[in-house]
Amino acid sequence: MWMGVGDSSGSPKPIRIVVVGEKGSGKSSLIMAAARNTFHPNIPSLLPYTNLPSEFFPDRIPATVIDTSSRPEDKGKVVKEVRQADAIVLTFAFDRPETLDRLSKYWLPLFRQLEVRVPIIVAGYEVDNKEAYNHFSIEQITSALMKQYREVETSIQWSAQRLDQAKDVLYYAQKAVIDPVGPVFDQENNVLKPRCIAALKRIFLLSDHNMDGILSDEELNELQKKCFDTPLVPCEIKQMKNVMQVTFPQGVNERGLTLDGFLFLNTRLIEEARIQTLWTMLRKFGYSNDLRLGDDLVPYSSFKRQADQSVELTNVAIEFLREVYEFFDSNGDNNLEPHEMGYLFETAPESPWTKPLYKDVTEENMDGGLSLEAFLSLWSLMTLIDPPRSLEYLMYIRFPSDDPSSAVRVTRKRVLDRKEKKSERKVVQCFVFGPKNAGKSALLNQFIGRSYDDDSNNNNGSTDEHYAVNMVKEPGVISDTDKTLVLKEVRIKDDGFMLSKEALAACDVAIFIYDSSDEYSWNRAVDMLAEVATIAKDSGYVFPCLMVAAKTDLDPFPVAIQESTRVTQDIGIDAPIPISSKLGDVSNLFRKILTAAENPHLNIPEIESKKKRSCKLNNRSLMAVSIGTAVLIAGLASFRLYTARKQS
């Protein structure tokens, strides 16, 4: 158990094995002995690339073995080869202790400095004069080294008298690449690593067809045939159970193999040097060397879209996620607590929301738990901004479909939405623009139920973008008509934000928030609106724009209401929406944003394109506008002042 081993890689690309070490440590001799099955006492100081065909190795995967120079002046060439290596063979000679010392004093520290993260095999060259090293085994000699440098997979001894050992060195180097120990097993503590446990749990649950938490004899046989194309005979299963009852009683019962027993069996495979069997099973279920699902399993064609299209979860995926939530919300209190979330993602490499991007982006309960609305909102956000990651994690939590692409859909182009004068998008992305201290972060806090003075979303001078996501729904239960709103705060750089056309095309609605008590804040917000609307119009990806008058708990600047109303009327958008995050009064802003998105043909600023404006600028100069008078020229005075300033 398991019986039979198939090809665990299937990759035709040759594996690059780079041989490194001090002069006289046997680098070139090792390569020559392995490749030609003969020992040459007189060989060149540096061999050319040695290509070993697939027939050379049991796994029938070719390799290119690269000799390196020991001369200090050739260090740059060695570094280049090491950076491109799939595996490194680090050599020393038993009769030259200084070559062993250099492994820990120079070569291994160098590899760490270069951040080389490939398997390393230490090869000890045994000379004829055995008294030179007093019959110490290579395990005794290298044990301290391997404890200090865990990247060393194994150490192997070879000699000119036993040429098959030279082949073994290269074979182990290749196997360390094809079936690496490092990702799956903690050799210091002799336990499976967390990612390997997660992958094996997923395989166990996928193989447990009746979902009783046990792999029956029939289910074990199906797993065996899937992975190795060879069934188990009844006596083999019986023998496995008998051994398990003696060595690990909790691993088996009268109905079959438990999850703990399954993990125990796979641990034994590694301890018995049968790691290839484990990797064969992992790869049959789509895992790559980093124990994530391979790119070939993620249907990237499902995400092909134009710049003004987005990706959303389908109703099938949403219903699946609801069922998952209800299953792991063990007490049914509509609060998926952190430990319950941990159980949910036990079959994934880690939680998908550990990245800083997802920190503090949705509403959390006092204990850090998530309501169903917040849970679904996070999935919608991940699907919007990183569709492959979303689909990958749906597969980790066992989305029940042979076609993973059925979990997502690409929305209609926004240009077609405008022609139809309606949008059916269920996830709306709203870009939040505004000058510094206008109240952007406070608005995002308000949206996800955080306090007005919570500074977790404050940019603190950062130019990074920040998200907040939540469902905007009518009171009552969640329905298919509820929509998810994503607020994306666009941080302002010192030289202006100047988002690219492609970045702006993803915007469904833009709001421009300003401090209603500060005239400069108002003028800056108008400048931003003009710039954004112009870029959008020139690119052909226009979208509704709204002005938001924040901090209405403060006294407005003189003629604020009259001026803001006149400007918005002249450019064809709604009057500014008054809000006060401090008082918790947002005037139903979030519903108004969704309404604007549902009517993509409205609230489009009437702004001239740069081309038309350039022609007019050649024929007349722009009039200056005095502070407080706000005399508009065709409703675009603030915009033209901004343009004149940019061109001066």
Swiss-Prot record:
UniProt xrefs under Gene3D superfamilies: EF-hand, P-loop containing nucleotide triphosphate hydrolases
Residue ranges that the Swiss-Prot or TrEMBL entry lists as coiled coil: none
UniProt domain EF-hand: residue ranges: 195-230, 316-351
Protein's recorded name: Mitochondrial Rho GTPase 3
Domain Miro: 12-179, 425-599
Membrane topology annotation: Single-pass type IV membrane protein
GO cellular component, one term: mitochondrial outer membrane
Residues binding Ca(2+) 1, per UniProt: 208, 210, 212, 219
Keyword Translocase appears in the UniProt entry: no
Family: Belongs to the mitochondrial Rho GTPase family.
Modified residues (Phosphoserine): 11
Mitochondrial intermembrane membrane side: 645-648
